[in-house]
Amino acid sequence: MTVWMRIRAALPWLVVGALASLVVIVALLPAAWVTPQFSRATGGHVNLVDPDGSLWHGSATLLLAPGSDRSASTLLPGRIEWRTAFWPLFTGRVQMRMRQTQAMPDAITINASLRGATVSAGAMAVPASLLVGLGTPFNTLDLQGDVRIGWSDWRLFGQDVFGQLTMTINDVSSRISIVKPLGSYRAVWQAQGANSTLDLSTLKGPLFLEGHGTFAGHASSFTGTARADDAQRENLAGLLNLLGHPIGPGTVSLTF
């Protein structure tokens, strides 16, 4: 057997060995390499901090911030934990199971490849005070209450995203209002490719919020109303003035 024939016979095994080494290297990347990707993708609003472990098996803490300035950020109690499956890496896919020890004990599955990514349906419960870290208007309102978030399967293909997320806030109160609770509310985010919509509705008052928003690329708009129950109109007058411009008795417009 000539040298070239030997090289030709060994080449497939060399390629397999190189690919296996690359997969192992990627899988053993430290968690500190993974976490900055979340910050860049969300403009600094959603961050994974205090990472531990690796891409293979690691954990981190969720931090919400108004942007690059983290001085007013908030932390979600508990840890986000993930495990990456080994064999899918050989087919060019990343398959990861992720859970949050306190807010989301039931794990979700993330599948990603060069063609796109999917996130399985899930749900989590967080305190409304966590939203303060997102900045205005949440830091001004300083909301208290229980937030429950549920979502369908989400699919990402290039710049197009498909899925639905529903957030329900029960018995909301605010430090700037003597009326407690203000009410319970539901917001539904529907992603439809390059466009998405947001619908806000009230489950119970005395503060009633309604609105609809559209988002397409860098363009976005939201219009709605905030209205006080007649019995609490006087007590809610100050909060209504902060939320929008008066358009009627005990009613203001919401425009963002």
Question: Language-model features: where?
Answer:
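Extended terminal
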Residues: M1-V16, T35-A41, S177-F256
